[in-house]
Structures are given as structure tokens and as C-alpha cells.
Amino acid sequence: MAPAKWLIASLAFASTGLAFTPEDFISAPRRGEAIPDPKGQFAVFPVSKYNFDTKDRPSGWNLLNLKTGDISVLTTDADVSEITWLGEGTNLLYVNGTDSVKGGVGIWISDAKNFGNAYKAGSIPGAFQGFKLAKSGDKINFVGYGQSTTKGDLYNEAAIEKPVSSARIYDSLFVRHWDAYVGTQFNAVFSGALTKNGNKYSFDGKLKNLVQPVKYAESPYPPFGGSGDYDLSPDGKTVAFMSKAPELPKANLTTSYIFTVPHDGSKVAEPINKRNGPRTPHGIEGASSSPVFSPDSKRIAYLQMATKNYESDRRVIHIAEVGSNKPAQRIASNWDRSPESIKWSSDGRTLYVTAEEHATGKLFTLPSDARDNHMPSAVKHDGSVSAFSFVGSSKSVLITGNSLWSNALYQIATPGRPNRKLFYANEHDPQLKGLGPNDIEPLWVDGARTKIHSWIVKPTGFDKNKVYPLAFLIHGGPQGSWGDNWSTRWNPRVWADQGYVVIAPNPTGSTGFGQKLTDDITNDWGGAPYKDLFKIWEHVRDNLKYVDTDNGIAAGASFGGFMINWIQGQELGRKFKALVSHDGTFVGSSKIGTDELFFIEHDFNGTFFEARQNYDRWDCSKPEYVAKWSTPQLVVHSDYDFRLSVAEGVGLFNVLQEKGVPSRLLNFPDESHWVTKPENSLVWHQQVLGWINKFSGINKSNPKAIKLSDCKVEVIDHEAGSYFDY
């Protein structure tokens, strides 16, 4: 380790103890979407909880009473990977990952009131998920997805012979995407049917691949696609799915289409919004998402962006008639928000949509025939919405949400009425005890061009008459935000309860504050966002007397990691005692190694070879910037990060070490852009929090705060000093 003066200021900081620890954070129960039964009496949701003693994560399913809010255990069988309502009373279909077919799954039918009394309806010969069901005569038609072979069969990894060579050969992009190299198999939506014999349903094992007949199509689209990428019409006859435009280069453009196809696959799927097609509004050629059929199965609502290479363009609601050549209608197209999901009311007259607004994921309603200037109405609820479903045939919805202060909020919301709380995790889980909205507040500051929002997150037991070091956290994206939602990776409450006041800014480039703020970061990564951050820091220094900026730290991931590297070479870098850069770009020209070229080609106004000056403009590795480096910096980068190569982190660490800047590299060979495995997450928190606590003085003021020595992973240290010491 290079010798250096690691100075710690000895200040009388407020000591918070450790109300919310990384262990609490990682081991707290994690609950999924609550899905109500057809009559709106009960909802089923998954739950899991990591155990540090046994090193496993037991999982199961619970039943939520929508009248009382009471929760009961439905099953603790970890092999049950998915449950959905059959559409008949309290009958359920569930998927069991252990099956007689090696590598396959079993389809089981049960009743929520007597779950143990289940029967097997059939087997599917491969991994399969995302069931959607609809009655069609005496059958229940279904769709779901798995991976497809090039021939169109459901891919079963257990049945594939291992090739004698490990070579990969590519003639087009992608080569790798997010955390994996692209192979010959691809995602596809398959259809099938359950047939009723007496009182029981059975599945004959026959699946129809609805995607493979369209050459180069894929749905759901990786890495984050899921069941929201397709839908089954209520009459069970038609399927809609989203795929990237098959005829266009996928790594360079975001253009995608909504396809429709008969459930039985009797015709090849066709796009309803092909660019320059007769049904597509003029100039609309961006990414499509969230197809959903109307209750009468005659219309499809979907979202689409305009720009063909911009993943953060504004989404606009479109409605197309099934089987018609009429152009799709744009709904509330002047609304300066970007919807994320849609559902129809039972009468088809109202759309319920989610959209981010001012750092909160909100639920809105609007008429399904709304004109361009219509402004949707917000529905009252707590926290941010992650999913919602209608309660029976009413206008009320069951919201699955979360917030900065709770990882699960189940509530009933009805337009024009107060929300009704069912279950809030922070009021039940001992790991979340003491968390609440009182420690969170918004902050608005004049930025480089407009007012900029931040969150102030205070530690448990906060005392305004005491002083707390600043933790300045910069989000990724850059087109993203610090929202009022729970993060399972970078969670401001964990940082705050080390003894900090967290400031989480939403500078230029952030989403949810109007499309202009999002767009304004284009080709300006180190410009307006940096100025915004500096102005926020100055405001905190001058106005928040309970925040000690002299002993503050700054940290960020992805774009936030880039910004930390940029700050290190700028004036703001001298304002912090320590920095943490997680998966941030370092060398401007290295961006060409990313997977999604459309991202950099949009954000830097051209290709790597045609607009090279734009890539070099915000190059953190320029000698004039590196010459200013002096703030201790922790670098985090993992091997499976194919969005930003691990070489970026290693190169950054190389320069920090050669310059003699106190520094450390944290690397995970089995993680990607995100660190998600529980034991790795614990080490991440021990190293990141231990690093900032060492330099901020927290370790002296709060004996219970995390120290670097708390991590039991051995440090690799082979040298006595810096290159420049000799």
C-alpha cells in the first residue's frame, strides 16, 4: 500500500449507534407483487429472506386478505417458482421447478383455501415462466416464455450436450449483453392450453412458439424483459408481444415493435407499429413497451418513444385496433411524463398508468380516448408504485409499492379517495424497525439551468442540534433518478445510519422532472450535471447547519461512478475526505467497449469514429485532470460488467496507485454491473462503508460504525510504496 498521510479530523460528530445495519438490510424479508383473485378477496405474493447462518434464502408464498390486511402462509415450498389465479374463484395454477422431466417444470392446480390438496396438470420440458391465462370455450389458453432453440423448440439446458469446443463466432452484434455472451438460444413466447376433463385440467405438453417464425425476433427482450413484454387477449384468441425491430441492428438502435399473432400460431406474427408503416404515427420509430389488450379484446394499448436510438426518450400512450389498418391513436401525447405501465378499467373507458413524477413512482388515470392536451389525474397512495392490479371489477386497485423508508407497501387505492393501508413492512419486520417517512425530506436548489431536486435522508434518532458528516450520493443512468423507492443495492438509509446525513441529488439528466431536464445531459456529461452537484453541495454547506461538509464523502455508481472520477480531477474533488467509484467510466475512448452502442451514440451525438471529440470531451483520464488527484478513492468493478468493462476500474486503480493516492480496488469475479449476491453485498457494504467511515471520522465518533477490519476477506497487498517513491 502506498504510504500517505491519511488524515482523520477529530470532531464531535453525533453518534447514532447502528439502527439499520447492512446485515438488517440484506436479511430483511423481500416481498414481490401481490396479485388479487378475480373477486378481490385475497392476493398472493412471494416472499424470501436471506439467512446469514445457513447461507441460503428460503422462499415461499403468502396470502393477503384484502379486507383485513391479515397475512397467512400459503406454502413454504421453495420449488414453487410462480403462482397465478386460474380465473375460477380461489383456484390457482402454480409452477414447480422440480419435475419428472429433467430440466423441466410441472404445472399444478390447487385452491388457495386448501393449497396442499393440489394435482399435477402436466409438464413443460424446459424452464418456463410468466404465465398469463384466459378462458376460451371449455379450455384455458395460456402464454408464457422460455428460451428457444434455433429450430423453435423450448430450450432445455439439461438436455443439451456440451460442445467439444468453447469457441464463439459472431457475424453481427450483440456479442455480449449486460452480464453474458450472446448465444444461439433466445427468448420466445410460447402458447398452450389447459383442457378440462371432469373437475380437473390437464396439459398435453404441446407448446407453440409464437416468436421464432419471425426471423431475428426475440421476446421478452433481454436483459430486463419479462411478462410485461407480452399479453394474452381476454378472449384467449390473440397474443401481443414486443420485439426489437428484426430488420435493424439491435446494438445500434432501440426501435422495437408490438406484434400480434393468433394464440394457436396459425399465422405468422405481424407488427402493428412498424416504422413508416400505415398504422404508425409519423416520425414514431423508438422503443415500444407494455402491450395490453382492452377488456373486449378489440384494442391494444402500448407505449412508444419517438427517437430510434434513445432509450430514455419520453414514452407516449398509443391505442391500436386489433385487425385494423387504421393508424394508432396517440393518447395525452402532450403530457410531459414518461408512462411505464398501463391497464384498462373493466369497462374499457379509463386507463390506469404508472409514471415517475418528481422522484416518486405515481399512479394516474385518464380516459382511454383522451386528447393530446389532457393531463392525467394522480391517485393518492404512499411511496412509489412498482405494480398494481384491479380489485375485482371495481375501480379500486391493489398497489404493490415501496419507498425510501420501507421495502414493501401493500395498499388499496381508489381514484378520488384516501388510500387504505394493508401491510407496510417497516411496521412489521424487526430489521426495518424505526424506519419511517419522518427522516426523509425533499430539497430544491437552483442548479445550472433550473431548480434541481434532491432527497435529504437523515439517520435514525436524528437530532437537528447535532452535526453529521455529509454522504453525497450520485445516481447512475445518467437518465435515472434517486426516487422515493427502496433499493436492494444502493440504499440511502443504510448509509445514513452509519452516522451521515445523505444528500441524494437528481441533477441534469434525471428522469421524472420533465423531458427537457432528461435530454439536457446529451453531450454534456461533465457540464451541467457537475455544476448542479457543485451548487447543491454549496447550498448544503451554507444552509444545513446539521451537516458537516468539511468531513463529507461522495460516492456513485455507473454514471455516478463516472461523475466521481470526473470530480476527482475538478475543484469539487477537494471538498471531500473520500470518494467511492463503482463501475464508472475512466478513459473516454474506452466507451466503445460497451454492449449497447445506441446509448453512447445518442449521448455523445454520433459514433465513436465520427464524433470522437465528443467522447474525449469528458475524459477523466486527461493528464491535466489526473494531475489534481489527491482524494482517497475506493474503486469497485466486477468481471461480468459488460456495460462498462472491468478494465475501466483496473485502469483507474493503476493510475491512483502510481500517483500515490490512497486507494483500494474491490473486485467481484462473479458479479456484473450490480452486486446482488448476499454475501458479496455484505462485503461490498463493509468495504464501501468502512472506507468512507475511515476518512470522514465516523469510526472515531461512532464505535459501532463499520470498519474496514470488519470484512474477513484477506487484502492482497504486494508492494511497499508508490512508483514515484523510488
Swiss-Prot record:
Q: Source organism's superkingdom?
A: Eukaryota
May I ask which residue range the UniProt record assigns to the signal sequence? Answer: 1-19
Give the Enzyme Commission number: 3.4.14.-
Region described as Disordered: spans on this chain: 268-292
Name the major location: secreted
Provide the alphabetized UniProt keywords: Aminopeptidase, Glycoprotein, Hydrolase, Protease, Secreted, Serine protease, Signal, Virulence
The reply on keyword Cell membrane is no
State which residues carry a glycan (glycosylated).
N96, N252, N485, N605, N699
Q: Which GO terms describe its biological process?
A: proteolysis
Which purpose does this protein serve, as stated in its record? Extracellular dipeptidyl-peptidase which removes N-terminal dipeptides sequentially from polypeptides having unsubstituted N-termini. Contributes to pathogenicity.
Give the family per the record: Belongs to the peptidase S9C family.
Name of the protein described by the UniProt record: Dipeptidyl-peptidase 5
- Give the classification, highest ranks: Eukaryota, Fungi, Dikarya, Ascomycota, Pezizomycotina
What gene does the UniProt entry assign to this protein?
A: DPP5
